[in-house]
């Protein structure tokens, strides 16, 4: 059996899709379905069972036997960078993760988990997986940073794989439940469907992000599990691209429209990252050599998926 926490979420459901593609359906999905809209992410996928997150944690703490487990992909967390309830974040992103980590280490189960590029804070270069380059700017980033530090202390003594991925700007299928936290490509597509032009903040041609397609993220997770990889790694494309490039890819797909600019909000000016770019040196050294989709390639694929009902009519 394979366990995927946060399995109804964007990255979790794409990992399940990738597992299905290699013939694995013996999957226990763990999640909090308080947001019932997330159910749609697994409708076309195959799983064996579902367990509520709170019940799962209680079972983990109690030391319950889940049978033979081949791996745990821990994607369940509060992923909102605007959440400032520190107690809630630490319970969900830190304490929960520690319980799962020790459960896996004690039983020598491969443990693959979601970290975040938010651990780097507002830096503009040297996105390197080392403590000296990290300095989160929000409570979410701190919760992820603290767990990375915990893992670093445990790694030398572990006899099974522990692998964390600092996700950069992930976009792609199965994110519609995320609301305001969904990718810019998702929001721009919605604007186009309303008959509007895609809108970007003034200066967006200078705002560069490492946008990584979610299917590539899932692919790296499966590779790491299959190859027994340990450590903490950046997971982006290694190339920053502009929001303008995203908008142009959306326009190209729809075959109409032009970019409109809107004023940059004052309240974001002091805490808005103008640049992110994963340093992939460590991931490449670990053996991952496949290419990542560019923004143009990934956005085109995503637009086809998002608008599939329109293109099949």
From Swiss-Prot:
Q: Which residues form the active site?
A: 140 (proton acceptor), 178 (proton acceptor)
Gene3D superfamilies per UniProt: NAD(P)-binding Rossmann-like Domain, UDP-galactose 4-epimerase, domain 1
What does UniProt list as this organism's lineage? Bacteria, Pseudomonadati, Pseudomonadota, Gammaproteobacteria, Pasteurellales
Record text on subunit structure and interactions: Homopentamer.
- Gene of this entry: hldD
Q: What is its EC number?
A: 5.1.3.20
Catalysed reaction(s) here are: ADP-D-glycero-beta-D-manno-heptose = ADP-L-glycero-beta-D-manno-heptose
Q: What is known of its domains?
A: Contains a large N-terminal NADP-binding domain, and a smaller C-terminal substrate-binding domain.
Function field? Catalyzes the interconversion between ADP-D-glycero-beta-D-manno-heptose and ADP-L-glycero-beta-D-manno-heptose via an epimerization at carbon 6 of the heptose.
Write down the required cofactor(s): NADP(+)
Q: How is the cofactor bound?
A: Binds 1 NADP(+) per subunit.
Q: Which organism is it from?
A: Haemophilus ducreyi (strain 35000HP / ATCC 700724)
Which UniProt keyword terms apply here? Carbohydrate metabolism, Isomerase, NADP
Per its UniProt entry, which superkingdom is the organism in? Bacteria
According to UniProt, the name of this protein is ADP-L-glycero-D-manno-heptose-6-epimerase
**Main EC class the enzyme belongs to:** isomerase
- What SUPFAM superfamilies does this protein's entry cite? NAD(P)-binding Rossmann-fold domains (SSF51735)
Residues engaged in binding NADP(+): 10-11, 31-32, 38, 53, 75-79, 92, 144, 170, 178
């Amino acid at each position: 059996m394979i366990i995927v926490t946060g399995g109804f979420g964007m990255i979790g459901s794409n990992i399940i899709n990738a597992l299905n593609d290699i013939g694995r359906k013996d999957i226990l999905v763990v999640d909090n379905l308080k947001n019932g809209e997330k159910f749609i992410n697994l409708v076309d996928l195959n799983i064996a069972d579902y367990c509520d997150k709170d019940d799962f944690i209680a079972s983990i703490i109690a030391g319950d036997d889940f049978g033979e487990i081949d791996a745990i992909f821990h994607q369940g967390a509060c992923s909102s960078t605007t959440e400032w309830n520190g107690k809630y974040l630490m319970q969900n992103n830190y304490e929960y993760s520690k319980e799962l980590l020790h459960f896996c280490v004690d039983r020598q189960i491969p443990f693959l988990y979601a970290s975040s590029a938010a651990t780097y804070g507002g830096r503009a270069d040297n996105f390197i997986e080392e403590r000296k380059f990290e300095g989160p700017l929000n409570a979410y980033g701190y919760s992820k940073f603290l767990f990375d530090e915990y893992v670093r202390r445990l790694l030398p003594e572990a006899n099974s794989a522990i692998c964390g991925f600092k996700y950069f700007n992930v976009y792609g299928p199965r994110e519609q439940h995320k609301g305001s936290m969904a990718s810019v490509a998702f929001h721009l597509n919605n604007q186009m469907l309303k008959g509007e032009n895609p809108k970007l903040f003034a200066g967006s041609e200078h705002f560069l992000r490492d946008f990584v397609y979610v299917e590539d993220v899932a692919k790296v997770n499966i590779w790491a599990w299959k190859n027994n990889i340990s450590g903490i790694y950046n997971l982006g494309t290694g190339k920053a691209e502009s929001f303008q490039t995203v908008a142009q890819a959306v326009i190209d797909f729809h075959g109409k429209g032009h970019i409109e600019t809107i004023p940059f909000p004052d309240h974001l000016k002091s805490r808005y990252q103008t640049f992110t770019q994963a340093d992939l040196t460590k991931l490449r050294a670990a053996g991952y050599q496949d290419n990542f989709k560019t923004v143009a390639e990934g956005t085109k694929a995503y637009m086809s998926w998002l608008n599939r009902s329109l293109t099949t009519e």
